[in-house]
Amino acid sequence: MPLEMDQKVNKLTFGCQRSSTSDDDSGCAMEEYTWVPPGLRPEQVQLYFACLPEEKIPYVNSIGEKYRIKQLLYQLPPHDNEVRYCQSLCEEEKKELQMFSGQRKKEALGRGNIKMLSRAVMHAMCEKCGEKINGGEIAIFVSRAGPGVCWHPSCFVCSTCNELLVDLIYFYQDGKIHCGRHHAELLKPRCSACDEIIFADECTEAEGRHWHMNHFCCYECETVLGGQRYIMKDGRPFCCGCFESHYAEYCESCGDHIGVDHAQMTYDGQHWHATETCFSCAQCKVSLLGCPFLPKKGRIYCSKACSLGEDVHASDSSDSAFQSARSRESRRSVRMGKSSRSADQCRQSLLLSPALNYKFPGMSGNADDTLSRKMDDLGISRQGAGFDNDFWKARDEQETPEDHEEWAEHDDYMTQLLLKFGEKGLFQQPSEDNRSTEHWMSENIKGKNDLQRNNRNKSLASKKYQSDMYWTQSQDGLGDSAYGSHPGPASSRKLQELDMDHGASAYMHEKMPWYKRSLECLSDNLKPQNENIRDSMDSLALSNITGASVDGENKSRPSLFCYQNFQDLNTRDCEKMSNMGTLNSSMLNRSTESLKSLTSEICQEKPPPEEKPMHTSALRRSKSQTRPQVKFSDDVIDNGDYGSIEIRQPPMSERSRRRVYNFEERSQRPHHHRRRKSRKSRSENALHLATDSKPSGKERNRFYTAEDYERLFHNKSAHQVQAYIQNADLFGQYSNAASNVGLPSKVAGKFLGLYGEDEDSWCSTCSSSSSDSEEEGYFLGQPIPKPRPQRYQYFSDDLCSPTNALSSSQFSQRTTKSKKKKGHKGKNCIIS
């Protein structure tokens, strides 16, 4: 045996000292090693093993010995060289194995030579670590690498596995030394199942390793997994079924296997399906995916309250109330901001979808029938239950959220109008939450409740005012600039709805669609504005839109009108200011201040004893009036055409001096042109009550007495009565007031002093703004609008409020587009 030969040589030649426990005189100095390097003296063997780690020295019956045996089998696999150790080779593969083994031995196999360097050698370097090997030290040389290449004994390892080459056996390949296993794998793939070299033409490659085709199978059931799904566990392939049955985890929530196809959540040795159902709070079942959780007693919770077993949904009554309020506010916010629309679009959607005569559900037919019915139903006080109580009750009860419609998707405002109303003759009013607003009412209103309850006549006017109040309340919350700041059809449409309160179906004879009128209104904004007295008038027009007073933003006005009928009808809705202000500012033209009748017999208020000097108050623009001027469409223009209304005229002593018409002739006279009459200011509403066309000279001296009016209505036909009524501005609203009011002489004198015979010198404020170079009666080549004759003048006792006027937009009708931009010059003033 080679080992015995080495031992004999070492004993006889060197007689080196042994580290074993055997007797030194036994002559068995090398017997303590299971293997020693060949060709070395005992002192050289000792020097060599001294360079190795203690656990790798092959002492007999030591760990080093076991390590050596293991490395022999691993680094030098017997099935890489001998056919008899192979299990599944065919004849062709056996022959190929023999050829492969012989070629490796011939070309790469070798054993390292241990030599002690001469002291003269000064520049030897280790190939592994690159450090210097000094003279007199042990070094290992490899014949296949060349004479000058050497390694330290501890550096003589496989280049692949970095393990000491067992028994100094190496395979040299491409300048590197390898063990037999890894050298063979450089040439041929090795099967991970049988550990044999694969000589077949085909193999399976998975997980960075190779298998024989039939060797890549489930480790449990040996099912071939080539082309199939598999799971690697501890370096071994398993089919899905075997893996789930042997290694799959159980879900802590549902108790089922967590399959290979399911993601799982793991915490502290527990496993859950990675689903919202399984990985959820054990108390409230809220999903905890991606959320922090609180583990407690093998269960997970979303909060400390749930871990204590509390019901997070339980709450006291106050908390429920807050939650309910938040829910309502949330729903309101969703309604107001749906479809990502801007605030203006939301306001427009509320403005532009009212139902047809939604304030008058009973108003139908032509204008004559409607107005006649309205005047017949009008009473002294606000009526009780009306014929449309059910309608208002239904409106109060229903709350329908505004549906998402196609027109709301368009950014262009006119496109929205055409899409929503282009082919509809009816409007639809979305109901809105009723929100109570502050009632700005005069004190004596509350005392008239008994009289109102007793009067059971079904007054359409009463329902109209109820609808005004309802409209004001339901539109609350849009902001005080909802209409005043928008110069487009929104403001126009809003004022048109106000006029529908008074005129209802007076527009029925003109079938032009409303959106065309709105388009005309938009065109007005593109025209230049005149810089004259209209500046102050325009500021008042803005006041009408935004609801701000000329005298201040929020200045409260004293209630001067105490007439029971109109006091209650108007203050209920007019003095109740909403956030929008459009309705209320328009209705203030017939508010308690402007409806203080000079001829009231019910309230015997006397004018102030001393005569205050007449002067025009300076107009001050408020904050809300600094916005761009709002133009109104033809919807708000009053031209004085009204339906047939029964009217009683006051006596001559109660009427101001003015020109009147021959109403019978006027009804047959064609309208060559109709001048525009818009809400330029509140004074315009009060003073611009004259007729539209100039009367002839013979008509100027003709006056009607109260008896003439009565005879006219009793003797004339319905058509003539209608023609007569077409110039009546205020009787349509206050028909029953004629016989109940009287005119104090002092106030009448003061009023007649303001309205003199010379219509061109009404007021210094207006006349001073007129150009002296202009032709009399014309301005900029256009006729100056003439005041319309009044039947009553309503103003306060001291004439101190700029709002002492009735709305001039009642029962208004359209004018031609060419007259829309003509400014109102010098014939209007403010009563201060």
Curated annotation (Swiss-Prot):
Subcellular location, principal: membrane
Residue ranges of every copy of the PET domain listed in the record: 14-122
One GO term of the biological process aspect: convergent extension involved in gastrulation
Propeptide: 830-832
Record-level Gene Ontology MF annotations: zinc ion binding
Ranges of biased composition (kind: Basic and acidic residues): 432-453, 603-614
Membrane topology (UniProt): Peripheral membrane protein
A cellular-component GO term for this protein: plasma membrane
Tissue specificity of this protein: Expressed in the dorsal marginal zone of early gastrulae (stage 10). As gastrulation proceeds, expression expands to include the lateral and ventral marginal zones, excluding the few rows of cells above the blastopore lip. Expression moves dorsally with gastrulation cell movements, and by the end of gastrulation expression is seen in dorsal mesoderm and posterior but not anterior neural ectoderm. Expression becomes down-regulated in mesoderm but remains strong in posterior ectoderm through the neurula stages.
Protein family according to the UniProt entry: Belongs to the prickle / espinas / testin family.
Quaternary structure annotation from Swiss-Prot or TrEMBL: Interacts with dvl2/dsh and mapk8/jnk1.
Record protein name field: Prickle-like protein 1-B
Gene that encodes it: prickle1-b
